[in-house]
Amino acid sequence: YAFGYPS
């Protein structure tokens, strides 16, 4: 999870 996106 990074920058509000999955994975």
Curated annotation (Swiss-Prot):
Keywords: Amidation, Amphibian defense peptide, Endorphin, Hydroxylation, Opioid peptide, Secreted
Expression by tissue: Expressed by the skin glands.
Molecular functions (GO terms): opioid peptide activity
Modification sites for Serine amide: S7
Residues bearing the modification Hydroxyproline: P6
Subcellular location, record wording: Secreted
GO cellular component, one term: extracellular region
Gene Ontology annotations of biological process type: defense response; neuropeptide signaling pathway
Protein function: Dermorphin has a very potent opiate-like activity. It has high affinity and selectivity for mu-type opioid receptors.
Family: Belongs to the frog skin active peptide (FSAP) family. Dermorphin subfamily.
Protein name, as recorded: Dermorphin
Native species: Pithecopus hypochondrialis (Orange-legged leaf frog)
